[in-house]
Amino acid sequence: MKSFSLQTRLYSGQGSLDVLKRLTNKHIWIICDGFLARSPLIEKLRDALPADNHISIFSDITPDPTINTVVQGIAQMQSLRPDVVIGFGGGSALDAAKAIVWFSRQFGIEIETCVAIPTTSGTGSEVTSACVISDPDKGIKYPLFNNALYPDMAILDPTLVVSVPPAITANTGMDVLTHALEAYVSTKASDFTDALAEKAAQIVFQYLPVAVSKGDCLATRGKMHNASTLAGMAFSQAGLGINHAIAHQLGGQFHLPHGLANALLLTHVIHFNARDPRAAKRYARFAKACHLCPDNANDTAALNALIRHIELLKKQCALPSFADALKDGKQAWSQRIPSMVQAALADVTLQTNPRVADASAMQELLEELL
């Protein structure tokens, strides 16, 4: 038996921030990073909130939010006792807000509403039961999954993402594709998650190059924003796989941006997983659903078309090679493989990978990357 549930109310499109006008006479706590706290976007958010609200801001969020950041946030939440928490920013801010609210509730601190407002189009965190918290001392990222992590409300306003730089647009867009593809070949995939994943990927292949080159196009940004959420809904239900299990280690140990790490792994992982007959057929079906090959193409031709189009998409987005992305980390690569293998094997996202991966298979995959 498989289950499927949507627990977050969505508001999308230009002007969707206006839904916040319903919040009156509340203590609203905004969780974001320091850059956003000083940017015009925070004023745009403030302007959307009625003047009778009391607003507090927690802006100590860094990329890959840490355990310490979450602990600080819980302490502030205990002190402030807000009515509403708004996670505002990229995946790091949304993950931190969700984790802070979740852990605070376990201490008996309740809020009326948790709102997620993404300012990048990538993680899908606004509609998932997942968050990722880092331990910089150990170089490990911990993905957490719990239905209590779903935000109550998500707002997808494309005007909040038009200023995202091309490189970040590319990285986060490839994260969307990875979410869709891993959900599609997951052992927990269903007709419902397939539909979400297919639509998300179709949008990425069509609109991501335009979003990277013409970031001020609201229609394109809106499409990518929706794709991110569609893929988030897909993987939140179906799970992920070895791509994310390894990407978490590349982020934790080499500080590669998460979306970039996923993008650089993607075709290697497809080759790895396609040795499983079921996964190979699913990849072929995915390629046909995204119109990357003729409908009558055989599975091998469809699989090759998928790999070819992903490599083309990476080129269109001007992504670096794996070696260039690692920079000085290349010297430490070989010696860190054993620890990355062990951490990836323990990563919860590996549980729904279509091909079973043991330590030797994982090591072989990592060794071929560089």
Swiss-Prot record:
Pathway listed: Polyol metabolism; 1,2-propanediol degradation
Keywords attached to this entry: Bacterial microcompartment, Iron, NAD, Oxidoreductase
GO cellular component: bacterial microcompartment
PROSITE patterns for this protein: ADH_IRON_1
InterPro entries assigned: ADH_Fe/GldA, ADH_Fe_C, ADH_Fe_CS, Alcohol_dehydrogenase_Fe
Main EC class the enzyme belongs to: oxidoreductase
Source organism superkingdom: Bacteria
Molecular function GO labels: alcohol dehydrogenase (NAD+) activity; metal ion binding
Catalytic activity line of the entry: 1-propanol + NAD(+) = propanal + NADH + H(+)
Pfam short name (any one): Fe-ADH
GO annotation, biological process: propanediol catabolic process
Keyword Hydrolase: no
Protein EC: 1.1.-.-
Gene3D superfamilies associated with the record: 3.40.50.1970, Dehydroquinate synthase-like - alpha domain
Cofactor annotation: Fe cation
Function: An iron-dependent alcohol dehydrogenase required for optimal 1,2-propanediol (1,2-PD) degradation. NAD(+) and NADH are regenerated internally within the bacterial microcompartment (BMC) dedicated to 1,2-PD degradation by the PduP and PduQ enzymes, which reduce NAD(+) and oxidize NADH respectively, although there must also be cofactor transport across the BMC.
Name of this chain's protein: 1-propanol dehydrogenase PduQ
Naturally occurring in which organism (per UniProt): Citrobacter freundii
Gene label: pduQ
